[in-house]
Amino acid sequence: MFYHIKELQYQAKPAHPDPVYAKKLQEVLGGQFGEISVMMQYLFQGFNCRADAKYKDLLYDVGTEEIGHVEMLATMISRLLDNAPADVQEDAYKSNPAIAAVMSGMNPQHAIVSGLGAMASDSEGYPWNAKYIISSGNLLADFRANLNAEAQGRLQVTRLYAMTDDPGVRDMLSFLIARDTYHQNMWYAAIKELEERERDIVVPTTFPRELEKQEVSYDLFNFSRGDESSQGRWAHGEAFDGRGEFRYIPAPIAFASAPHLKPAPMWLHNTVPPMSKC
């Protein structure tokens, strides 16, 4: 179960209202790599975890912290919308707040739909989507997805930090940036621990290697003009799983012939291929 404490994990007080920035901040709340996404991703990985108790507990720890980050951002967005839209529009638009909201760059749904509150959507008003989250049951795969989510999230928050000079907003964002720093390090540590325990880096580690076409397991195919990619570490030397040698293939060949499909049944009304001449 969850137990709510009314105090925020960290303060979320802007120095002044800014409905346009509130729209931008929606991205790290309800966007693909926003706090709702990582909250749901970690919690569902925790709900579904069948591995060690320490990993399940870690997922619950971080997932529950992310609930607090959702709360902080929702609070900040609501406060940025205080006195909006009328008090922040030019005199020419004050007689029509809806028009003023659109003309100023504010998200009109913040006034019409949520009543000056945050929404579970991104900066363009697109609703949060459960397809954003990954919970596969394979912790090595999932933790790598978590590391990417934290990296993308931190990147977006740092960009938002540069888009405002409000000291209160920057203060809260600096806290979130710091937490993302820890979370990236944390997931990296968990990934390395699992790699060492499973003695492999290729997911899934439990699939028998003899069942894959090992002749191409470590080949880089040059499928674009130029050969600059041959200069990378991924093109030569021992592979990082320790089970093969990287090879650069400058002129890849086809391993199969051109495919020819049978005509579809007539009742599907597909285009019929031309009849061959006798």
Swiss-Prot record:
Family of the protein in this entry: Belongs to the manganese catalase family.
InterPro entries: Ferritin-like (IPR012347), Ferritin-like_SF (IPR009078), Mn_catalase (IPR007760), Mn_catalase_C (IPR027407), Mn_catalase_dom (IPR039377)
Protein's UniProt name: Uncharacterized protein YjqC
Signal peptide: none
Domain of life: Bacteria
Pfam families tied to this protein: Mn_catalase
